[in-house]
Amino acid sequence: MFSSKKSLLLFKNVRYMSTSSSKTVGFIGLGNMGGHQAINLIKKGHNLIVFDMSKDNMNRLKEKGAKIANSPAEVAKEADVIVTMLPASAHVKNVYCGENGIFQTVRPGTLLLDSSTIDPATAREVASIAKKHQSTMLDCPVSGGTGGAEAGTLTFMVGGSEQDFNTAKTYLECMGKNIVHCGDVGTGQVAKVCNNLVLGISMIAVSEAMNLGVKQGMDPKKLAGIFNTSSARCWTSELYNPCPGVIETSPASRGYTGGFGSALMTKDLGLAVDSAKSIGEPLLLGNSAHQLYTLLVAKGDGQKDFSVVYDFLNKNFKNSN
C-alpha cells in the first residue's frame, strides 16, 4: 500500500501531468502589474478565473475572456493553479488565510504562486500553512515594472523546491522571460528585497546627478546619453530616466503617473531595512533611501511613480547662484 505521503505525491503528479491548457488558473490582484500578467496567461491559452477588489479591474479581464469570482475562496474552488499579485504582507495573509480566503476552499494538489513582494518570513509562514492544506506554495516576486508585465518579459525570482519550480515554470514563462530558481521557499523574496534596494538607491543617485547637471546648464538628454555610454550606465538612467522629456514613454514624461508608486518603493525599502536589522547588518544607503521615500509619501507623492524623487530634488533644493 502507498503511504499517505507517497499517495499525496502521486496525486500531485497526476494533476501536474495533465495538459496546462486543461487547467483552470486563478488570478487574484489585477492592478498595474497583475492585470497585465493575467492577460498574458489568457493570451497563452489558459482558462482564467479572477478576483480583485476593483470591479473595473475584473471587468477588464472579463472582456478578455476571464471568469469573475466573488472572493478568493471562490477562485480556489475552481482553480488548479492560483497566482496572486498583492501590495503587501498583510494583504497576502488576508487573501490566503482570512475569511473567504484561499485556504477556506483550496483543493489538495493546488499550485500557489505568489508574485507579491513581501518579507521572507511571511512567505515561509504562508507556504507552511499551504502544506497543511496539501497544496504547494512558491514565492515568485517579479522585476521589470509595468512595461515588463505588459510585454511578458518579467524576471521571476522563485523560492521553492526544484521539482515545484520546474512545474511552476510552465505558467511563469507565460508572463516572464527570465525565470530564476533562487533556492528554498523565501529566497525569492530575499532576492527581490535586495534587487529593489539597489533600484531605490540608484533612482536617487541618478535623480541627484541629473538635477546637479541640469542646474549647471547641461542638456538633460545629452547628460543621460553620457551616463548611458559611460560608467554611470544603469537601468534607471537608460530605460527609466527620472528627468521629464529624456524618455518620452517614461512616467517622468507624463507627470509621474502610472509606473511603480513611491509608496510601494517605501514599503520595499522598509522590507530591506527590517531584513538587515534581523541579521544585524548595517544598511547605510538603504536607511537613507528609505527615509527619503518616507518623506515623499508624507508630502503626498505616494501614488506618483518613484522617479518623482527627481522632481522633489529639483523643486526643493534651488540653485543659490
Swiss-Prot record:
A GO molecular function term, named singly, is: 3-hydroxyisobutyrate dehydrogenase activity
One Pfam family recorded for the sequence: NAD_binding_11
Which residues of this UniProt protein bind NAD(+)?
Answer: 23-52, 86-87, 117, 267
Superkingdom in the source lineage? Eukaryota
Is NAD a UniProt keyword of this protein?
yes
Quote the subcellular location field of this record: Mitochondrion
**What family does the Swiss-Prot or TrEMBL record give for this protein?**
Belongs to the HIBADH-related family. 3-hydroxyisobutyrate dehydrogenase subfamily.
**Which PANTHER family is this protein grouped with?**
3-HYDROXYISOBUTYRATE DEHYDROGENASE, MITOCHONDRIAL, 3-HYDROXYISOBUTYRATE DEHYDROGENASE-RELATED
Protein name per UniProt: Probable 3-hydroxyisobutyrate dehydrogenase, mitochondrial
Q: Which gene encodes it?
A: hibA
